[in-house]
């Protein structure tokens, strides 16, 4: 199985304060299975950063096997410029992808 596409969505909510806008990614496979994950930075300006990092990370996983989530996690952590320096935005991006991969694995 291979990852064919990743959509990154900046959702809107109907909340009165309008500050909560989740970042969700959907990973598609060549076998028709998809998985959803969320970057947990949905408040304030960090949501924009989370959206950007998930978009950047998404490009790196196209063609990879979604069932090898540890290999993908390691690639995002070790081979990206900011990965090993960590921080909430980086780990929110990795987590969104990792959650979507587990969703795929559960549906497989």
Each language-model region and where it sits:
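Structured beta-strand/loop patches that form or line metal/cofactor-binding pockets in enzymes
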Residues: 1-42
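Metal- or metallocofactor-binding catalytic centers and their adjacent structured scaffolds
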Residues: 28-108
């Amino acid at each position: 199985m291979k990852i064919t596409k990743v959509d990154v969505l900046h959702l809107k909510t109907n909340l009165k304060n309008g500050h909560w806008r989740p970042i969700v990614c959907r990973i598609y496979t060549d076998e028709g299975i998809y998985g959803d994950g969320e970057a947990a930075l949905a408040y304030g300006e960090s949501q924009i950063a989370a959206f950007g990092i998930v978009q950047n990370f998404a490009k790196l996983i196209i063609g990879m096997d979604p069932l090898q989530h540890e290999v993908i996690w390691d690639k995002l952590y070790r081979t990206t410029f900011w990965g090993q320096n960590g921080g909430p935005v980086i780990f929110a991006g990795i987590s969104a992808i990792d959650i979507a991969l587990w969703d795929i694995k559960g549906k497989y």
